[in-house]
Structures are given as C-alpha cells and as structure tokens.
Curated annotation (Swiss-Prot):
Gene name as annotated: trpB
Functional summary from the UniProt entry: The beta subunit is responsible for the synthesis of L-tryptophan from indole and L-serine.
Organism encoding this protein: Shewanella halifaxensis (strain HAW-EB4)
Protein origin, superkingdom: Bacteria
Reactions performed catalytically: (1S,2R)-1-C-(indol-3-yl)glycerol 3-phosphate + L-serine = D-glyceraldehyde 3-phosphate + L-tryptophan + H2O
Listed Polar residues bias regions: 404-419
Protein known as: Tryptophan synthase beta chain
One function term, GO molecular function aspect: tryptophan synthase activity
Transmembrane feature ranges: none
Length: 419
C-alpha cells in the first residue's frame, strides 16, 4: 500500500511522542484504504448531501462590492448543518474512527464550531465525545458550549497557558496519548502531525471543487482570486485545493492582524513567525527571542492560534498563495457591513476574509471575479460583537464628554480673562 508524503516542502512531519506513532500510522492506513473503498465514499457522500446539506450555495452579493467592476461571490459554508465548514471533515473523520473500531472521540475547539460539528457527528454515529476548550473561549462562545452539551458532549475547560485554542490542542493531545487504543483524536484544522493536514484537506476539498463547478456555470470562467481566512487553515485549504493547479487563480489567505500586524497583539505566524516545532509539526510559529511560543491574539476565537497548517506554509514559500491580514476593527466593520448590505451575518473569522475582498474589489481597474469562503455563520459571535460595540460607544461618549468639558473650561477661562 502506498504511503502519504508527511511533508509539504520543508513543513509538516510527525513530531510526537513515540507512544503515538502507532496511532498515527493506523490512521494513515485507514485513510488510504477508505479513499479506495467505494462503500465508505458512498456513505460519506450521502451524509454530506442528505444530513449536512451539500452542495452549499455560491451567492453573488448584490450590494457588498464598492466597485461595479468587481463581483464578490460568497461560498456559503454558513448554510451547512452545524453552521460552518467544520462539519465536512468531522463527518469524514468520525466515519474513519468507526472504521478503526474506536468508541470515543476527543476534540479541541476554539470558536466552538469544530466542537459543535464533532458533537453532532458523535450523536449521529453513536460515539462518546469529549471536547477541550480554552476557558476564555468557553466564556466568549457560550451558545456553542450549550449546543455541544445539548448533543451529549462533555466540554472540558482548559485553564493552563493563555486558556485559548493552543492550550486546548495540547490538552486534547495529552488525553489521546493515554487512550489511543479506544479513542480517536478528531483534530479540527489542517495542522498538527501527519497525516492530519492531508486528511483534513481531502475531507474539505469539496468546498473548492463545488466552487469551481458553480462559478463556471454562473460566469463561464474561473475567478481571478479565491479568498479565505486562515487560522490553522482548514477552510482555506479546502477552498484552495482544487485551484492550486489553476495558475490564473490567485489564492489569498487572510490572517488575523488583531490590534495591528506590527503590534504584539495578532495571530499572524505567516507574517511574523519563525519556523519551529509545535503541535506535532514543523511550521511557522509565533516565538519570542528565546524561542518560546508567543501568545496569539484575535477578536475571533477560531483564528486565535500561534501557528498555521504546513501546506499553507509551503504555498507561501513557493509563492503559489499570498497571505494578507485584516485587523479586529476591519473584521468588526465588515461583520456589520455584510449584515446591513446582504442580510447575512458572517462568523468573525469569515469577516476577516470578506474585509480583504472588499478592499481588493475597491482597487479593481478591470472586470474582476472574487470568491470568498464564508466559512461559518455569525450567531456564535453576536453577543461578543454587541459587547464590543457597546464598549466602543461608551468610550466614544467619554471622549466627546471630555472634549465638551475642555471646550467649556476654555470658554470659562476666556470669559474670566475678558473680565
């Protein structure tokens, strides 16, 4: 049986404790066999179509583009059962777990979308489910926490480190190392040790394959660019995979610039990371001067990750894909803009990609076709955004009050001087 290549250029690999090597090799073998098994593929396709709701729509926005020369299409993964692209590959991995005879599923989650997708797949397929989630993310994603519990999952808050996604990943991996004989670690992004980046890409690649078919039907040609947000990078690699061999299509990933790409408050390892070993892989990693992992930051929990999938690192290194960034403020503005212009509330993660697409559309000087992966819906973010907007309103009122007070003081001083 052929084996998969564990590397993408210099990135990737299997940097895990020796105890986990048999589990990873078993997973690789099961995946290769499943790819060639007609019955497995039929069951996976049936679940995607009749349970998850594929294919998802490709929507031409009517009011979003600021430039008549540029059309912006949205690939509507927000319409998928579970609310995001995560459901695609979770169903694939859950079927693989059953194929390997596993009874339990371990997962990590940031925004909660992967946790929800894992919980629904486990409920459907009769698997026990436990999800590790950073304590900070538990607080800012309470609707998704309740959804997971409602579907029977055990949600375990992680308080170590920064209490965010990277810490949840570490705890999930630690748990798995003690019970891999009966449990499958259902990793949520196209990162981590081989064979996960390849498995996740293959179980997400229908995003780009559908997009290609749909845009050819609608426009008679391929898009000028496909755009997706990048944290670990699963939604982006799912969109990019079918376009990598189409050189006329630009592949654009959008990292979270947080408070500013040149501040310490961001989550952009492709911009400011150095190659390191993290989460079982060799990849760009946010590190301090002593090589320690730096804390990442983003307003969106799902992009709050200090590294990135190895295939994205390789695509950047060879110049096939470019990786831009969008700040918290740009994402928040676009979150509201899409809701007002199109009646669609995007996930904050997706809003980063849409923000960059709007910027690109504005600059177009010829007819331009842009497709953005709307990777998830924004229900989970409405309370977070409402709180931030309220804080901004209070701060603005304080500034205006201070300005008014200063003007009154100046006026009083002038009147006193005139006396």
């Amino acid at each position: 049986m052929s084996k998969l290549n564990p590397y993408f250029g210099e990135y990737g690999g299997m940097y895990v404790p020796q105890i986990l090597m048999p589990a990873l090799k078993q997973l690789e073998t099961a995946f290769i066999e499943a790819q060639e098994d007609e019955a497995f593929q039929e069951e996976f396709t049936d679940l995607l179509k009749n349970y998850a709701g594929r294919p998802t729509a490709l929507t031409l926005t009517r009011n979003l583009s600021p430039n008549p020369l540029a059309k912006i299409y949205l690939k509507r993964e927000d319409l998928l059962h579970g609310g995001a692209h995560k459901t695609n590959q979770v169903l694939g991995q859950a079927l693989l777990a059953k194929r390997m005879g596993k009874k339990e599923i371990i997962a990590e989650t940031g925004a909660g979308q992967h946790g929800v997708a894992t919980a629904l797949a486990c409920a459907l397929l009769g698997l026990k489910c436990r999800v590790y989630m950073g304590a900070k993310d538990v607080e800012r994603q309470s609707p998704n926490v309740f959804r997971m519990k409602l579907m029977g999952a055990e949600v375990i808050p992680v308080t170590s480190g920064s209490a965010t996604l990277k810490d949840a990943c570490n705890e999930a991996m630690r748990d798995w190392s003690g019970c891999y004989d009966k449990a499958h670690y259902l990793l949520g992004t196209a990162a981590g040790p081989h064979p996960y980046p390849t498995i996740v890409r293959e179980f997400q690649r229908m995003i780009g394959a559908e997009t290609k078919r749909q845009i050819l039907e609608r426009e008679g040609r391929l898009p000028d660019a496909v755009i997706a947000c990048v944290g670990g990078g699963s939604n982006a690699i799912g969109m990019f995979a079918d376009f990598i061999d189409e050189p006329e299509v630009a592949l654009i990933g959008v990292e979270p610039a947080g408070k500013g790409i040149d501040t310490p408050m961001h989550g952009a390892p492709l911009h400011h990371g150095k190659t390191g070993i993290f989460f079982g892989m060799k990849a760009p990693l946010m590190q301090d001067s002593e090589g320690q992992v730096e804390e990442s930051y983003s307003v969106s929990a799902g992009l709050d990750f200090p590294s990135v999938g190895p295939q994205h690192a390789h695509l950047a290194a060879i110049g096939r894909a470019t990786y831009e960034s969008a700040t918290d403020d740009e994402a928040l503005e676009t979150f509201q803009l899409l809701a007002r212009c199109e009646g669609i509330i995007p996930a904050l993660e997706s809003a980063h990609a849409i923000a960059y697409a709007v910027k690109l559309a504005k600059e177009a000087t010829k007819e331009t076709l842009l497709v953005v992966n709307l990777s998830g819906r924004g229900d989970k973010d409405i309370f977070t955004v409402a709180d931030i907007l309220e804080q901004q309103k209070v701060e603005q009122q304080k500034v205006e009050q201070q300005k008014a007070d200063n003007q009154n003081t100046e006026k009083n001083n002038q009147e006193s001087g005139n006396e």
